[in-house]
Amino acid sequence: MVIILAMTNREKFKVLADQIKISNQLEQDILEQGELTRIDVSNKNRTWTFQISLPHFLSHEDYLLFTHAIEEEFKEIATVAIDFSIKDTNNQDEFALKYFGHCIDQTRLSPKVKGQLKQKKLIMSGNVLKVLVSNDIERNHFDKACNGSLVKAFRQCGFEIDKVVFETDSTNHDDDLASLEAHIQQEDEQSAREATEKLEKMKAEKAKQQDNNESTVEKCQIGKPIQIENIKPIESIIEEEFKVAIEGVIFDINLKELKSGRHIVELKVTDYTDSLVLKMFTRKNKDDLDHFKALSVGKWVRAQGRIEEDTFVRDLVMMMSDIEEIKKTPKQDKAEDKRVEFHLHTSMSQMDGIPNISAYVEQAAKWGHQALAVTDHNVVQAFPDAHNAAEKHGIKMIYGMEGMLVDDGVPIAYKPTDRNLKDATYVVFDVETTGLSNQYDKIIELAAVKVHNGEIIDKFERFSNPHERLSETIINLTHITDDMLTDAPEIEEVLTEFKEWVGDAIFVAHNASFDMGFIDTGYERLGFGPSTNGVIDTLELSRTINTEYGKHGLNFLAKKYGVELTQHHRAIYDTEATAYIFIKMVQQMKELGVNNHLEINKKLTNEDAYKRARPSHVTLIVQNQEGLKNLFKIVSASLVKYYYRTPRIPRSLLNEYREGILIGTACDEGELFTAVMQKDQSEVEKIAKFYDFIEVQPPALYQDLMDRELIRDNETLTQIYKRLIDAGKSANIPVIATGNAHYLYEHDAIARKILIASQPGNPLNRSTLPEAHFRTTDEMLDDFHFLGEEKAYEIVVTNTNELANKIEKVVPIKDKLFTPRMDGANEEIRELSYSNAKKLYGEDLPQIVIDRLEKELDSIIGNGFSVIYLISQRLVKKSLDDGYLVGSRGSVGSSFVATMTEITEVNPLPPHYICSHCKTSEFFDDGSVGSGFDLPDKKCPTCGNELIKEGQDIPFETFLGFKGDKVPDIDLNFSGEYQPNAHNYTKVLFGEDKVFRAGTIGTVAEKTAFGFVKGYLNDQGIHKRGAEIDRLVKGCTGVKRTTGQHPGGIIVVPDYMDIYDFTPIQFPADDQSAAWMTTHFDFHSIHDNVLKLDILGHDDPTMIRMLQDLSGIDPKTIPVDDKETMQIFSGPESLGVTEDEILCKTGTFGVPEFGTGFVRQMLEDTKPTTFSELVQISGLSHGTDVWLGNAQELIRQGICDLSSVIGCRDDIMVYLMYAGLEPSMAFKTMEFVRKGRGLTDEMVEAMKENNVPDWYLDSCRKIKYMFPKAHAAAYVLMAVRIAYFKVHHPLYYYAAYFTIRASDFDLITMIKDKTSIRNTVKDMYSRYMDLGKKEKDVLTVLEIMNEMAHRGFRLQPISLEKSQAFDFIIEGDTLIPPFISVPGLGENVAQRIVEAREEGPFLSKEDLNKKAGLSQKVIDYLDELGSLPDLPDKAQLSIFDM
C-alpha cells in the first residue's frame, strides 16, 4: 500500500532546513527544490540515514555546513549518515575536483598518505575518476587501500562515479618512494590513532565550554614572532611555497567548530595588492580559541605559514603556523591647519561613488577637519545619514549637490538679423583644428560653401600652418598630415581672406558654437573684433524640427535627408553635406511658418527647450535652512519637471530658488571651466559673476583631458588654473581647491572602475578614471605647489575654511513627528469610541470597558495620535461603504479604541459575552479562556436572547508601548482590486500635493556585484584569487542603483507644511509616466517625522467581496465557531471527502494561512479545535524558532498542549501578568523575547518567584522573532470566514478561489473525472523534485480541483458563448472557466473575445482568429479542450452571402 504523507518531500526538506537553522544560508533554488525523500532508522545501531535529493551540487563549503548542521542537530539521538542524489550532474567533473579532498578524508588511509594523495592530479573521464600517481608502488598501494571506499564516498555526495582508477603519471619521478614506503608502514598504527581521538575529545569538551565566551586576550598572538624583513606582497604569491610571511587587513572572518571539537579560523586578508585566505586550527592544550576571538574585521595581522593549493576551493591558501595582530598607523592629515572638502560623492551618486557618507565623516573627524560637504550627483539622498554621522562625530556637515545646469533655451540663431530666409545668402562652413579649445588650439583647415536660392554658388577651402606637429588623434580624425600643412599659409592670411569672402552672409554650421568660437577668437586676435554676421546652428535646428530623431549627428542627418557624406571630419566634405542638409531644413522651416532669420528663435523654441541644452555641472551648497528648502525644490523640479535622460536644472529655476544657496563652478564639466577652454578672459569673467565660488581641482583629476588631448600639456593646464584664479579675483569670489572625491583611499579606485565598466553607455568608460580619493590637507597642498606656497595655502586652507564659516548649521531632517491636522480629531475619536461602545455594551458601560477606553484615549489624545486613528477610520469606512472589508495587520488590533472606531474587527478585551438586546455582559479576565469565540453558546440570563461572544485578550501595550507614547503604525489590508481607490482617496482627504508614495532606494546586491566583478576581470583579462574577488565584491556592494516605492506606504504631509519641509520628491526609478510621485529620501529616513499610512493590497478582502456578491451573505454574520467549519482544520470529513480521496489529512487546501504544506503539517500535529488554537498556529507558523525545535517538541513530549505553548508575542505579557509579574516586567520580558534577546537575570528571577515553569523560560530563550496576536487574530478571522464558505457553499468558494487566488491552470486535466485528476496529483507528488515553479503552481490548483471533484462538482470546458473574461461562473453543479485561464492568453485578448462575441457568433476558427486575435496555439488548445465543437476551420460561403 502506498501512503501519501500530507507533507511533500520538498516541504520536509524545508522543515529540516529550518530545524537545523541554515535556511537563510542556502541558495534559493536549493531551498525551493531540495527534497527529503526518505529517512532510514536503525534502532539497533542508533543510526539515521537521510536520503536527500538536490537540483545541483552544493558548493563544498555549503556541503560541509549542511552535513555538519544535521549531525549536530541529531547527535544526541543517533549517529547520522547522509546520502545525496543530484538531479543535474552535468558539471560533476568540476565539483568532483572540489570534493576530492573531502572524499579522501572518508577513507581509512593514514593522515600522511591522505595528504600525499590530495596533491595528485585528477582527470575525469565519463563516470571514471583517474588519479595520476608517481609509480607502480603508489598505484598498487592506493588501489588496495581504497578498496572501493573512495567511490562510496563520492556516491554519498551525489556523484555518479562508478570507478576510481589509479594510473601512473609518466611525467612524475620516483623521488618520494622512500617516504611513501614509510607512510605505508604507519598505516596500521591503530593505537596512535586512538590516542589522537582521545585527545581530540578532551579538546572538544574544553572548546564547548569556551564557545560562547568572549575572548580573554586583548590581542591575537599565536606562534613565533614574524620578522618584518620576510614580509612579501600578497600579489607575489603565485604558487605553493613552504614558508611565506605576509601582512594585511582582515576583511572577512569565519570561526567554526569542527566535529572533533577543535576550531578553525578562516581569515580573508588583503594588503591591497591582492588578497589571500589564511587558515589555522586550534592546537592541543593551547588557548588559541581566545586569540582567534580577539580578531575582527578591520584589524591588521602579520601571518606566516605554508602556501598550498586548497583542493576544496581550488585556490592557493595559507595554512598559518604563526599569526600576530599588528598596529598599522592609519592615513593621517598632519597639517597644522586643515582644509575643508567641498566636493564629495558618496554611494548615493548612482553607480559612481563608493563609500557611504558615514565613512567620509568618520575619516574627516579623525583627521581633525572642522567641516565636510556632501555633493552627490543630482540627488541629496545622503543627507539624513550625513546628519546622523556628523552628530555622532562632532563635525559640521555642509549639505550640497552637484547638479546639471542648462540654459532655458539654446538659441538656434545667433545675432539674428532681419533677413528673409529664402533670399538670404549663407556661408556654410566647417573648421578642422589641432584640438577642441579655441583658446589653446589652432585652425588647420577652413572650408566653406556659399549658398543662395538653394544652390551652392561658391567654395572656399584653405589649410593653415599651425607651426606644431599634429597629434595622432587629430591625424586619424581629420586625415590631415603634417606634410599637408608645411607650405600652408598663416592663419592670419586665411582668416583675412575668409572674412572678405564671407561678406554679410549668414553663417551656417553644425554645432556652430564650436566653429564660431574659433572664428571669433581668430578675428579678435587680428583686431577685427568678433563677427557681426548672423548665425544658424543646424545641430540645434535639427533637434527642434526633427524631435522624432534620437540622434542629430552629421552622419545620421545625411542618411535621413538622403545626402552623400564622404570623408567625414574633412572640412570641405562636411561643409558640402551640411549645406545640402540645410537647404532642405530651410524648406522645413517655411512649412512651420518661419520665413525670417529674426523668427527662428521665437517660433521654434518651445517649453521643452531645456532638453536641447547641453548640461554643465554645477555645485550647489546649502548656506542656511531656507537654502535647504530651496535646494529640495530645485532637486524636485529637476527630477519631476525637467528630467530628460538626466535631471536638469534650468538657469531660471536656479535663479528663482538661489536664496540661501551658494553656487560653485564644479569640475572640468562645469560651465566656467569650459569657458576657459573656449572663450576669452573677458567672457570668462562675465560668466564667473553668476557664481559664488570657483573650484579648482588637483591636476590628477584633469589627467583624462590630457590623455584625450583636450588639454595639450602641463603648461596649458597651468594657464587654465591661473585664468580661473584671475576670474575669481575679478568677480570678487573665492577660489577653493576641491577634491571631487569618489572614494576614501587610493586602493578603493578599483571598485569605481568596476561599477563604471558595468555601464556600457557611461561616457566615463571612454577614458582613464582620474585619482579621486579623499585627500588630506598635505596631499592637496602638494597637488597645488606649482602655484606657489602662498597661493596653494590660500585656495586649499584659507578659502575653504572661510567659506565653511559662512555656512550656518543646517538640519536636514526634523526631530519630531508632524501629523496632519483634522479639526476636532480628539473629540471625534472620543465620541466615536464611546458611541460605538455604548451601542455594543449599553449606555451603562461595564467598568472594564471604561477603564480600557480611558487608558487608551489618554495615550492617544495626550500624544497627539487622534488624527492618525481618524485618518485610518476614514479610509476603512470608505472601503466598507464601497463594499470591501478591510483586514488589519500588525498590532492595531491590540487597541480597543481601534475596534470601537471600526479600524479593526479584532476586539482586544478579555473574552466575554454580550447581549445584543439588553446589553448584559460577562467577562473572563482570569486567563481561563483563550478567545471569546471559544466560549460555549449561552442564553442571556436576563432576557433569554442568544449571547454574542467576543474578546481576544490582547494588551494595549503591544501597540503603543508600555507608556503609550510609541507612534502608532496602522497597517491595513485592503482588497487588492480596491487598493488603488484607497490610495487615491488619500488625495481627496488631504489634497494631491500632500500625499506621496513612500520612496525606497535600491542598491547593488552582493550577487549583482559579483557579476560586475567577474565581468570586469574577464574584460580586462585579469585572473584573481577568490579572496580578492570577494574583496572587490564587498567594495561594490551597497552602492545606489535605482529608486522605487513601498508597495502600500503613503506619506501624508500636514496642511500647515509642504513636502519640501521634509524631503524632495521624484518619480520611482525616474519613470516620468508613473502615476504617483515618491519621497526622494528613503522613507525610513523620515519615518519619525511624517505620517506613513500602510495601505496594502491583499487577496482575502477581494475574495470575501466576491463570496458576498455570489451568496448574498454578509461575512460579518458568519458564525466564527461553526463546528463543521472548525472541523476542517483537523480533518476533511465535513467536506464530505476522505483523506485518501484528496491526499491530505486536513480540509484546508486553499484556506488562507492554513493551506501550505508546512502549516498543514502543524495542523496534523496539533489537531486544533478552537479559534484561539488557530491563532496560536498562525503565530507559531510566522515566528522564528517558535515552533521548530521549541513548541513542537514541547507538544510531542507531552510537556504542554497547543493552547499553553507560546504562540504570539502578546501571550507572554498576558501569561506573565496572570502568573503574578508586575505589568512593566511582563511587558519588558515580552519585548526582549520577541526581539530574540532572551531573558535577563532579573526576568528569570521574577519568573521563578512567580512559579513560571522551567520549560516556559527555556522556550523564551530559544525565540528569535514573534508574531503579534492581533495580526494573527485578524488573519484567522478572515480565514475562518472563507473556510465557512468552503464548507457550506462550496461552489461559491471554488469560483472565488480560482478567480482570485489561482493563476496557473491545466484546464485539460481539470475537466477530467475525479480519478484522473487525483492520479495526476499523485504523479506530480512523485515528481515534485523535478517540477518547475509554474508546474508547482499548477499542482496547487489541481489539489483544489481534486478536492472539488471528489465533492461532486466538476469543471466545464471553456465556452465561447458563456465564459467570462476573468471570472469563473457557476452553472448548476459545475464551474465555467474564464478565457484568462487559458495558458498563454492575456487580459486584453480575454476581454476582446467577450467584446467580439457580442457582435455576433464566431463562424469559424479563422473568424475567431480575426475577430479576437487568438493565436493558432491558443485555438489548438481550445480545440483540444473541446471548446470549439463543430466550429469549422474556415466559414463556408453560402449563396445567401453573395
From Swiss-Prot:
Keywords: Cytoplasm, DNA replication, DNA-directed DNA polymerase, Exonuclease, Hydrolase, Nuclease, Nucleotidyltransferase, Transferase. GO terms for molecular function: 3'-5' exonuclease activity; DNA binding; DNA-directed DNA polymerase activity. It catalyses: DNA(n) + a 2'-deoxyribonucleoside 5'-triphosphate = DNA(n+1) + diphosphate. The keyword Signal does not apply. Its main location: cytoplasm. Its EC number is 2.7.7.7. GO terms for biological process: DNA-templated DNA replication. One of its GO terms (cellular component) is cytoplasm. It is found in: Cytoplasm. It is an enzyme of class 2 (transferase). Pfam families: DNA_pol3_a_NI (PF14480), DNA_pol3_a_NII (PF11490), DNA_pol3_alpha (PF07733), DNA_pol3_finger (PF17657), HHH_6 (PF14579), PHP (PF02811), RNase_T (PF00929). InterPro entries: DNA_pol3_alpha_NTPase_dom, DNA_pol3_finger, DNA_PolC-like_N_II, DNA_PolC-type_N_I, DnaE2/DnaE/PolC, DNAPol_HHH, DnaQ, Exonuclease_RNaseT/DNA_pol3. Signal peptide: none annotated. Residues 426-582 form the Exonuclease domain. Belongs to the DNA polymerase type-C family. PolC subfamily. PANTHER family: DNA POLYMERASE III POLC-TYPE, DNA POLYMERASE III SUBUNIT ALPHA. Required for replicative DNA synthesis. This DNA polymerase also exhibits 3' to 5' exonuclease activity. This is DNA polymerase III PolC-type.
